[in-house]
Amino acid sequence: MAKEFSRGQRVAQEMQKEIAIILQREVKDPRVGMATVSGVEVSRDLAYAKVYVTFLNVLTENADPNLVPNGIKALEDASGYIRTLLGKAMRLRVVPELTFAYDNSLVEGMRMSNLVTNVVKNDAERRSASGDDEEA
């Protein structure tokens, strides 16, 4: 009977949970801000892990354009500390080397949602305007 998930996928899921907790409770760098771990990809030999993060501060109107690069830089600077805490939290022979990448799927999803909302609103306005013209 085959396993549903490979060991790498199970380790990645557990790492995602643990790194999220570490970022929330242990990392005090203000550049990290409201970082959320959206996914983790682990190499087959579990030596490397790519951690995808989103920053919820990006969604605000007056967001700093350097927020994402500064946040990723802060996470890269703290990767050794995060890796140490991850090693204590998880029982792995070798703790993967962490690299951080920005995941813009949340921002893109919000943008797409806004586009759809605007199209529906414009369509409703056109229908009401054409309905008014036909009645006159």
Curated annotation (Swiss-Prot):
SUPFAM superfamilies: Ribosome-binding factor A, RbfA. It is found in: Cytoplasm. Keywords: Cytoplasm, Ribosome biogenesis. GO terms for biological process: maturation of SSU-rRNA. GO terms for cellular component: cytosol. Its main location: cytoplasm. Transmembrane segments: none annotated. One of its GO terms (molecular function) is ribosomal small subunit binding. It comes from the Bacteria. One of several proteins that assist in the late maturation steps of the functional core of the 30S ribosomal subunit. Associates with free 30S ribosomal subunits (but not with 30S subunits that are part of 70S ribosomes or polysomes). Required for efficient processing of 16S rRNA. May interact with the 5'-terminal helix region of 16S rRNA. Monomer. Binds 30S ribosomal subunits, but not 50S ribosomal subunits or 70S ribosomes. HAMAP family: RbfA. Belongs to the RbfA family. This is Ribosome-binding factor A. It comes from Serratia proteamaculans (strain 568).
